[in-house]
Design a protein with these regions (language model features):
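A structural signal for well-ordered alpha-helical segments within the folded catalytic domains
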Residues: 47-54, 131-134, 172, 241
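Flexible, small-/acidic-enriched active-site or ligand-binding loops
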Residues: 152, 207-252
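Short coil/turn segments at secondary-structure boundaries
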Residues: 103, 175-180, 210-211, 236
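Short linear loop/turn motifs
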Residues: 147-163, 188-198, 212-216, 252
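Residue-level signal for nonpolar/aromatic packing positions in well-ordered secondary structure
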Residues: 17, 56, 67, 136, ...
Length: 252
């Protein structure tokens, strides 16, 4: 696994996640019109690990079937570039934009946008399908917005109207109003809110351990045979002297 792969003019170039996102155009479509943002978590680090896992599994299958090994060249930048397939294959489509703050899914549409509430909190609205948009507009008492969903992008006027609506009430008001409405609405949670979220609890995604140095474990995000992921056991604690003694004994 490397940043830019084992060949090409960048093969010896150093980099980190932000560099790979810049090189692949991700930062061009992420953030506000004024400036890109540095996303967190680091996209290429996790994407590259997943790509490596997929490639390793494929190589293991090939080894089992053909008794032939494989040399795997995984590039973090390549992996992020592959995640840009939608943007890259849509570049020639008339009227489709991925530019920062102006694209269909990068801030240019009112039905797929982040809005601020009266108490300086934020909500996400992703009512891209007409049924979700209609449900949202009806719930907030603005049926006149329904027919405007497909206005040309960027939808500056419509976005401003929806922005004023959300800014008129605190987050609790919008959660009470829209949580039960099928309109793809979700408040932007703070990290401390995630631990107690009922969906996270139901999915057994986190675990508070009883290690000497307690922390919250993020568990495997998959259920297998209807079984929830299980917490990992605490590593065995060993003092430095004990480790050195064991190491010396093994080396002798």
């Amino acid at each position: 696994i490397s940043g830019y792969g084992q060949n090409g003019p960048y093969r010896l170039k150093a980099g980190h996640d932000l560099n790979y996102l810049a090189y692949t155009g991700v930062l061009h479509s992420t953030g506000s019109i004024d400036t890109p943002i540095a996303p967190l978590p680091q996209i290429s680090d996790y994407a590259g690990a997943l790509q490596a896992t997929t490639a390793i599994l494929a190589a293991l299958l090939r080894a089992k079937l053909s008794r032939s090994g494989a040399y795997l060249d995984i590039s973090l930048a390549d992996t992020v570039l592959s995640w840009q397939s939608h943007a890259l294959t849509s570049m020639t489509r008339s009227g489709y934009s991925f530019s920062r703050g102006n694209g269909n899914e990068s801030g240019g549409c009112a039905d797929y946008h982040i809005y601020q509430t009266a108490d300086a909190k934020f909500v996400s609205l992703a009512a891209q399908e007409s049924m979700f948009w209609e449900n949202f507009c009806s719930a907030v008492g603005h049926q006149e917005w329904i027919s405007r969903q497909r206005e040309s992008v960027p939808q500056v006027s419509l976005i401003n109207e929806v922005t004023r609506l959300f800014a008129s009430q605190p987050l609790s008001h919008w959660c009470d109003l829209l949580d039960s409405i099928d309109c793809c609405f979700e408040p932007v949670l703070e990290t401390t809110d995630i631990i107690s979220h009922p969906q996270v609890i139901a999915r057994h995604l986190l675990s508070k351990n009883d290690w000497p140095d307690p922390l919250v474990q993020v568990l495997r995000p998959s259920w297998i045979d209807d079984s929830a992921p299980k917490p990992r056991l605490a590593p065995k604690y060993c003092g430095v002297s004990a480790v050195k003694t064991a190491w010396d004994a093994k080396s002798s």
